Every structure is written in structure tokens, then in C-alpha cells.
Amino acid sequence: MDKSKIQNPKSKIDNPVVFVGAGPGDPELITVKGQKALQESDLVIYAGSLVPKALLKWTKPGTKTISSASMHLDEIVKEMEAAYAEGKRVVRLHTGDPSLYGAIFEQMTALQERSIPYTVIPGVTAAFAAAAAMGIEYTLPEISQTLILTRMAGRTPVPQLENLASLAQHQTSMVIYLSISLVDEAAKILIDSYGADAACAVAYCVSQPDERIIFARLKDLAQTVKDEKITRTALIVVGKVLDIDHARLKHRSKLYQKGFEHGYRK
């Protein structure tokens, strides 16, 4: 692969446009580096449909903030380009981690075409905030060692080999993004592989003041979502790890077993 097509060779130049992962919503779950970028910014273009305004508290007085909720790509790039040309510090603030359903590659491409340097600061994605809220581990020894992050096909299609039915056959821990409005279809597909009585959960607005975590069985998932009137900003979580409590944990990692030797313990 030609790395020049996926990397910005000028990303280390002073004053690049900074793509920042805002985290799942709690202003304190942004990274220290992301917080610093906001504090130093002159312009913040934030994904207003998903990033809570509470994140903007890290900006200094006088920083211009623009919600991109109603903007298209050309408008967003135009704002960044104009501010950069004036020597301003520009932050593009995305929800969660920018690399996951953030549509940042097309923005980076547009900046690169204009010889505008950029850099990316990662963030905490909602799947990990959901695990923290539920008190679970996605990769329990001998239960599941794989985590799938995916979405249902909607207006944005997914590759045929990545459709939910194909992925569900692995019966791994799975977190489904951007698909709560398709919960009826999702539940039917998941039941075919995981079974009707498989444990699942819906994580709504994780880490935010109105967070809700709802546990259910797959056979009840669709109706539960309707009863709770959840229509957006929610994850669907499924997997055997949701059915293991502390009292019934039989399989433990070798890492902390007394007789397990490794480079730091013999």
C-alpha cells in the first residue's frame, strides 16, 4: 500500500488541524491531550448531533465553536481552511474515537489536497464506556477472546461479508453501533446465531447524565427498546460475557495464576 495515500507527511508541522476524539460524552473522559488541544484552540468544529456541548467547557474564552450537524463536507473543510490560513488553531471534535464511524478519512483527504497539515488524537469509544458501566469484560478467558464492533446496513451499506448475519455466526462479544432504529431486524438476525435466550444489553447515552443500561434476552430486545422509547444514541451489546457474574466465574486468566511464568515473574 502506498502510505502517502493514508498518511499526512506534514502532520508534525506546527499548528496542524487537530482531529480530537471527544470520548463517549462525559467531559472528563476526553484524553489529557485532547483537552489540551481544546484549551489551545481558536476554532472548534464539533459534531453537534453527538458531541455534548459540555465538552466545550474546555475551550478558552473567545474560542469560536461551530456545530457541524447541519453542514456538509465542503462547508466543514472551508471553515477549517479559512481558519488555518489565518494562523488559527483548529480542532475538529468528533464523538468517541475519530477512527470509528467518524468519517474523518474524507476530511483528511480534503486537507491533504490543500496541503494543510493535520494530526489525530484518539478517544474512548462508547463500547468501552458501556463495558465500564455494565461492569463486564469483553474478553473473558475461555468464554470470548474476540470483540466485534459493527453496524447494520442502513443508508450506508456494509460489505457483504460483513453483514450482521455473517458476523453473528462467530458468537463472540459484539457491540453494534448506529443500529438501534433497526432493532427488530437486528434481534431476529442475532437470535439465529446466539439463541433467543442469549443475554444482551442496550447502552443509551453511556457516561452522560441520562445514561441508561438495560439488560434483556434477545427474544425481548426489540420490545424492550420500544418500551424504553430509545430511538438513537444507543449501542446493542450481545455475548456470553453478559451472562457471567462474579460468583460463577470459573475460567481465570493464566496471567495472574501463581504458577504462570513470564518475562516479569518466574
Question: What is the role of each PLM region?
Answer:
Residues 35, 57, 82, 138-140, ...:
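Short secondary-structure boundary/capping segments
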Residues 16-17, 75, 86-90, 146, ...:
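A contiguous loop/helix-start segment that scaffolds small-molecule binding in enzyme catalytic cores
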Residues 57-58, 133-134, 189:
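Residue-level signal for well-ordered alpha-helical positions
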Residues 2, 12-124, 129, 222, ...:
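Class I S-adenosyl-L-methionine
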Residues 26, 97-170, 212-215:
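Class I SAM-dependent methyltransferase SAM-binding "motif I" and its flanking Rossmann-like core
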